[in-house]
């Protein structure tokens, strides 16, 4: 039996995390998402184009819950989406979300005058899959960790998107890439809209 693309994606994330534990500085320097502007600490630009994808495979070496919750979300939403649209489409949705999350993170916070360091984590892609799940199965019941109350997927996605927008604009819960999460949702919305377009003969 062939393993799902989502399971393979989780396995790659775990493998990269092991490398991060062994070589944290080198991995973050090369593969985290760094700002387009020079860093005030050293006056250097550390951004490279591949980072708009590779950052999503990195997670905090000092906080195991970072990778744990991201992989839980990836499995929870990704496997169900893959079951309906297939491996290539779920990967396209995920990586489109990762890229739009990165671009949003690079552009929006600096425009708001928010200083940026490096960005890591799969959460932009996971938020994208969350929205795709809500668009595909709006009435499916989900039980979030916070609050642990069953609710339809459309409401879950709406509440989380609203919270991310609120925290991003107000600056609350700093240290979390709120606009990247919203950017990931935009990417997946574009992909799902493309899936729904009628095919021309």
Predicted regions: what they are:
Residues 1-201:
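A detector for small-residue-rich transmembrane helices and their helix-helix packing motifs
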């Amino acid at each position: 039996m062939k393993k799902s693309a989502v399971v393979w994606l989780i396995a790659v994330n775990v493998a990269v995390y092991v490398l991060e534990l062994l070589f944290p500085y080198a991995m973050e320097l090369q593969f985290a998402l760094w700002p387009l502007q020079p860093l005030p600490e050293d006056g250097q630009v550390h951004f490279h184009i591949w980072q708009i994808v590779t950052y999503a495979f990195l997670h905090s070496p000092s906080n195991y819950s970072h990778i744990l919750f991201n992989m839980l979300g990836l499995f929870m939403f990704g496997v169900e989406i893959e079951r309906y649209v297939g491996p290539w489409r779920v990967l396209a949705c995920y990586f489109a979300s990762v890229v739009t999350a990165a671009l949003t993170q690079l552009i929006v916070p600096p425009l708001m005058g928010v200083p940026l360091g490096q960005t890591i984590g799969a959460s932009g892609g996971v938020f994208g899959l969350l929205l795709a799940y809500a668009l595909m199965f709006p009435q499916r019941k989900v039980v979030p960790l916070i609050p642990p109350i069953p609710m339809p997927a459309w409401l879950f996605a709406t509440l989380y998107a609203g919270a991310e927008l609120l925290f991003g604009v107000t600056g609350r819960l700093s240290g979390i890439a709120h606009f990247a999460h919203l950017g990931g949702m935009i990417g997946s919305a574009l992909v799902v809209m493309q899936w729904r377009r009628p095919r021309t003969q």
